[in-house]
């Protein structure tokens, strides 16, 4: 497979990602979760971004606070002064995206832009903090990905949108994305197969798979030739890669 020209992807394959910092072991998307992953040796941290009603960018997955914080309220409808009072699992504050950038200056950040409201604050942060070499952006919205590509061009590493993934799996390689970041299956449709991985590699596109927590499945996917795995169980993935001699 040709090497990617983007600096975000210059780590030897396979790349291990701590998904939300390691959501099975720590309160997800919190500084302690990311700190634990970095202590294990992770250089790639996966996170999500949401924006408050007053445009403050947060590292947080849901718009609704109930699942992780146990309180009513939507981030997009509340000012940061209110959202900042919430605690993940009752104890950890929701971090600002800027906190994550500052706390882990050597980490690469894989970012899922969750909403349209988060797009402009995210773009501003990428410019302000000169982050283009150390981030990759994905989204379930093709429109959001397209807007970011128009803003930054190929200097911004972007993952395939769902519609681009569908084209890739059907045999037509889309243009514009630097990487495929995908589940093993999308509903009934297999996504990660030997054939799809080979097709991506033929076009110079690495394949990262989420979210894989079982050691046997990690081995199976690595045997297929995937280039990265995202996991909620960072210790398990580290041990698998150590066993294979590919923990770097």
Predicted feature residues:
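Phosphate-group recognition and catalysis centered on beta-loop-alpha active-site segments
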Residues: 1-248
């Amino acid at each position: 497979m040709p090497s990617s020209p983007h600096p975000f992807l210059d780590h030897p394959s396979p790349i291990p990602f701590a998904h939300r910092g390691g959501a099975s072991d720590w309160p997800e998307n919190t500084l302690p979760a990311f700190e634990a992953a970095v202590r294990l040796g992770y250089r790639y941290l996966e996170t999500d971004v949401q924006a408050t009603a007053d445009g403050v960018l947060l590292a947080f997955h849901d718009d609704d606070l109930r699942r992780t914080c146990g309180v009513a309220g939507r981030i997009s409808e509340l000012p940061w002064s209110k959202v900042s009072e919430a605690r993940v699992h009752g104890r950890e504050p929701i971090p600002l995206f800027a906190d994550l950038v500052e706390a882990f200056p050597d980490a690469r950040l894989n970012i899922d832009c969750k909403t349209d409201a988060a797009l402009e604050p995210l773009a501003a942060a990428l410019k302000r903090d000169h982050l283009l070499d150390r981030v990759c952006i994905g989204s379930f919205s093709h429109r959001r990905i397209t807007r970011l590509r128009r803003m930054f061009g190929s200097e911004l590493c972007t993952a395939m949108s769902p519609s681009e993934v569908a084209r890739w799996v059907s045999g037509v390689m889309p243009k514009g994305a630097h990487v495929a970041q995908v589940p093993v299956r999308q509903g009934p449709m297999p996504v990660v197969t030997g054939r799809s991985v080979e097709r991506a590699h033929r076009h110079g596109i690495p394949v990262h798979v989420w979210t894989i927590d079982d050691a046997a499945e990690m081995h199976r996917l690595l045997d297929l030739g995937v280039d990265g795995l995202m996991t909620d169980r960072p210790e398990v993935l580290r041990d698998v890669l150590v066993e294979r001699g590919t923990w770097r």
